[in-house]
């Protein structure tokens, strides 16, 4: 029996802030946004500046389906946390303005009541933004959870969650579909020589591990308390967890294409099936 299609596409791979310069064009300057297609299901991870272009594409697809008399499936939008580089695209996500679409928004990093809804309202209000989420026309369901929960956003997709080591809390995800999996582990730090057991557990034997490679090991002592990790630590974790493929993510905004190419080459010398994430990169699982 043939497997159902499962693929990952990167719409933004930069961390901290967007970077639009001639020497970052190849890997792209948009911040965190990753699309996962599990058969007909669409799961989106993080709402950085890359979300805008993805949203435009999803609305075009929905219109084509409706023209054929078909109803688009609900979209699922997962947040790791709500630092600006992971939510800057939120007000500009075109599906929110399509009354024929429904979006489920998931988060597990905040505390208190109505966590996900509160995040939307606090971000989209004056003086930071002129209008609130009440302008959205789509159906919007807010889904709160605690890290450690296993979620079922679609009938045949499960999403495992863990808490990561980052300021203001952060969530890591493992998406399981049709006997395969992808782990999205960004915005986390590490203690040198002490692999994170939670990450090793959730990434065990995964088909693809996406990991926070903001820094190099040589840079890390200067930035150890910034809440980010290194691409080399990602290699060590991928090897220890038995991951089949590895993708470096959350690149420094100042990291040039030339520097990223060098990192990618060095990474492949240690872990053959690896990439540095770039906008437009599609990985079939």
How does the language model describe each region?
Residues 1-183, 194, 199, 261-285:
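Binuclear metal-dependent hydrolase catalytic cores
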Residues 45, 80, 185-186, 211-212, ...:
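Active-site flanking residues adjacent to catalytic metal/cofactor-binding acidic residues
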Residues 190-279:
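Cap/insert and terminal regions of metallo-dependent hydrolase folds
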């Amino acid at each position: 029996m043939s497997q159902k299609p499962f693929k990952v596409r990167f719409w933004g791979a930069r961390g901290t802030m967007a970077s639009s310069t001639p020497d970052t064009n190849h890997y792209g300057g948009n911040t965190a946004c990753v699309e996962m297609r599990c058969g007909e299901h669409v799961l989106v991870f993080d709402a950085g500046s890359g979300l805008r272009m993805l949203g435009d594409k999803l609305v075009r697809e929905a219109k084509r389906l409706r023209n054929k008399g078909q109803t688009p499936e609900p979209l699922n939008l997962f947040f790791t946390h709500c630092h600006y580089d992971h939510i800057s695209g939120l007000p500009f996500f075109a599906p929110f303005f399509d009354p024929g679409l429904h979006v489920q928004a998931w988060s597990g990093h905040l505390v208190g009541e109505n966590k996900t809804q509160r995040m939307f309202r606090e971000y989209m209000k004056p003086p930071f933004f002129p209008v609130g989420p009440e302008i959205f026309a789509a159906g919007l369901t807010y889904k709160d959870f605690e890290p450690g929960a296993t979620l079922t956003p679609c009938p045949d997709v499960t999403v495992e969650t863990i808490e990561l080591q980052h300021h203001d809390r952060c969530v890591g995800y493992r998406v399981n579909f049709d006997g395969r999996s992808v782990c999205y582990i960004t915005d986390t730090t590490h203690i040198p020589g002490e692999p994170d057991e939670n990450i090793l557990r959730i990434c065990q034997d995964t088909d693809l591990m996406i990991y926070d490679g903001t820094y190099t090991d040589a840079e890390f002592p200067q930035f150890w308390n910034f809440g980010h990790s290194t691409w080399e630590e990602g290699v060590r974790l991928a090897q220890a967890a038995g991951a089949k493929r590895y993708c470096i993510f959350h690149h420094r905004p100042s990291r040039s294409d030339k520097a990223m190419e060098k990192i990618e080459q060095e990474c492949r010398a240690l872990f053959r099936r690896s990439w540095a994430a770039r906008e437009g990169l599609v990985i079939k699982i």
